Amino acid sequence: MLNVELSGGKTLLQADAFKKPNMIDEARMETYLSAVRKERKNLAENVYKDEILELMGITSDGVPTLAGLMVFSKYPQGYFPQLCITAVSLPGTEMGIVGYDDERFIDSKRITGAIPDMLEDAVSFVRKNSRIKTIIDDNGHRADKPEYPVKAVREAILNALVHRDYSIHTENVPVRIEMYRDRMEIINSGGLYGKISIDALGKVRPETRNAALANMLELLNITENRYSGIPTMRNEFAKAGLPAPIFSAVHGEFKVIMKNGLYSDEEPADESVVEFCSTPRTRAEIVDFIGKSKNYVMSKIVNPLVKGGKLRMTIPDKPKSPNQRFVKA
């Protein structure tokens, strides 16, 4: 049985299974040790591997720390099932609003693995469930603009994974990604750490809740560990012409709210669908035109256009008829 104890501010894992080679990502560990030898030469010279692991907080008295587990184990959730990410894409602007086919979620995924793996999988989830605005410039060149700046999304997810509370009190609380029609929310347990206030975020150097974890990810070139995450988010949203991210810390949680700015009544992508439907179109034709899943297209685009009076159904008394077509109102 797994026994968790606190010692010197570190969570220790009395789990012999982690010591088995097949439970450790050996390639990641070697990358890390190579970086230590290169970047921390005063540490690496004449110091054995086991001593490096102790000094850098990966192990304590030969036992892996929680930080070490979350970075170097192939599957940390074998020990802590809820130290993961739950990600959902929703059809409306609030939880509980159902979509065209009464679905509660357009997409839902539990993202597991070590922190570097969860980060990449979470960014991929957001990409998959994001709309793309196509812009044609004066020279006829096409450019695709994502719903959310990818670099900012990555920083927000990384911040949630690195700075969340990993104490025994919150080990059953995943990081949450909730993609609504008009915004995305990224939520982690723990609230703000130390004396910093919301207004000071990105302006002053904060205290670090999980310093050893941040240092490991810095040496793996996953985070800069220079407190640049929030300024990067703000800058990326400004460059994209989107509202600045909103940060809040209430009820022991830290939340980032990112508004997409793509869902006004004059949204060009929606208008292109309306024009496409100048000729009555089937669901399949509209799905092919947009290039997204049926649930996504119907829940986030077609159904709102029908409710907004921009499209009408050719068989309004049988909305789910297989012969249904949609035409410009």
State what each model feature region is.
Residues 184-221, 264-266:
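Glycine-rich/acidic phosphate-handling loop/turn and adjacent ATP-lid/helix
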Residues 313-329:
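Short, cationic-aromatic polyanion-contact patches
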Residues 70, 285-290:
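A short acidic, leucine-rich amphipathic alpha-helix
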Residues 243-245, 306-317:
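A short, conserved structural fragment
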Residues 1-171, 177-181, 193-195, 199-206, ...:
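Active-site helix-to-loop segments that bind/position phosphate- or nucleotide-bearing substrates
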Residues 261-276, 307, 317-321:
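Short alpha-helical segments that sit at the start of domains
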Residues 147-148, 292-307, 320:
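Short amphipathic alpha-helical interaction segments
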Residues 278-283:
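Short capping segments at the starts of secondary-structure elements
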